[in-house]
Amino acid sequence: MARDYQVRKYIADNAAKYDDSRLTKVLVKAFDLICSNEEPNGCMSSSVALHVILRSLGYEPKLCYGLCVTPLGNEIYHAWLELNGEALDIAIYGNSHFSPFWNDAQLLPVVFENYNNTAIRYRDHVFDEDWKNCMISQAVNMGSIANYIAKAPHAQHPSGNGIWKLIFSILDETYTRSKQESLQRFVSKEAFQCQEQ
């Protein structure tokens, strides 16, 4: 898929408030990977990967998840990040552009936006009776980010752990065991948690 330079610019412009080229680079790279893979269901894996990366850059993101409401009123279980009280959701672009099940408006990534200004109504820790059946619930039931990285279905891929591969792809770095161990300290024993909106 061709790169969407307007969306890349939008991400870079919104990330500029942090005046951190490393942050801008990883957000644009995460977007590029979602587009090149035409990833429709990557909200948890993308959010976890960016959570690890942002912590390694010195930020304190929160990993959020819950039942969100789309512009046309459809409900979806979704995962995203929050940084300094603002939503960060690169994966919503993939959900809205590549999923055959998406029956709503195509959305831009949400990059450091106030919750009141987003097209999606994010509802952290809001669940319905079908929560236990959704893929995000299965990830949360693994207990911690470290367990999710180690035990998620894509973690057992023959060519290596999928989440670590995603992290290194977003960082645009070659995988090394020592670098993984360095990054691992940002996720070990960190439980899935979020504050209610």
Question: What annotation goes with each model-predicted range?
Answer:
Residues M1-Q197:
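A structural boundary/capping signal
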